[in-house]
């Protein structure tokens, strides 16, 4: 049997880049909760004893940026300098300006345009992907790496493994076969976990606890065999972590946020951006389109691309490829997609309810992936049943 190996990685919520994504999206949530028309482009960076938020925000909301930063860091578990950041005593720097009036007039006419007239907030191209290899219609490598990261955080917060600290990374290699263009997982080849830990735990206990409390509950037993390779904290020491170990920045984990290296990526990040930014809303609508194609049984695997020009509502192009797994020709699937999905940014925001913030709606997306999540707030995961035209 001809097989190949493919690998995806993830980082958990205490990774410095992911900390920054969560702060940026927590600020977006706060703005949209009070003013759904908020225009937000919020970046965050962090290093030892410091978090800075900066960017362009035009909103009627009254937002306490410093409180949001501290609350978000505290919620992740950054409560002392020992673990990488002290939420209550670190420096918080804020440099927020209004959205450029040049952009405002071109995109939304200073809030005068109707939803169907709102232009894209920038140029760019976005991809959506779906595959039938998991119930989530997501790549197995990405699903397993992401779930390992989430489980690491769970057993840290519930004190199952009290030696754990917030920062951590995971990586999973799966052996696949190609079945006429569809991806069929055979076995897990390698599992890698590097997690921050306290001074006192031994490497032997780290390995034993990770196997028992993280790997065993997450990796389906049918994918493990006696040849599966485990690299558990292979560097031998990971005490210094979080922003103390590495600088963090919003938008540096775009593959972890999407499909783990499968499909394709247009390069635009998600976090801290309101729905007029097609980097986010465009990527959400093409995920819904690709997922709907696979869920409707029209293909086993699907990628959809959309592209935009700044200030122009209609997309410049829509593309679909089913990797030769389509039950009908790709050109017919493309027509179905165009008939069933409105790619204009203002209409995406309405149809996917993207102007609703608050209750950590966007902050939730900023750790453990934007796609394949079973959560009603992830409206783009809702399948539209697509039926071929007679």
UniProtKB/Swiss-Prot annotation:
One of its GO terms (molecular function) is metal ion binding. Its cofactor is Mn(2+); Mg(2+); Co(2+); K(+). Binds 2 divalent ions per subunit. The metal ions interact primarily with the substrate. Can utilize magnesium, manganese or cobalt (in vitro). It comes from the Eukaryota. It catalyses: L-methionine + ATP + H2O = S-adenosyl-L-methionine + phosphate + diphosphate. This is S-adenosylmethionine synthase 4. NCBIfam families: metK (TIGR01034). It is found in: Cytoplasm. Pfam families: S-AdoMet_synt_C, S-AdoMet_synt_M, S-AdoMet_synt_N. Coiled coil: none annotated. Belongs to the AdoMet synthase family.
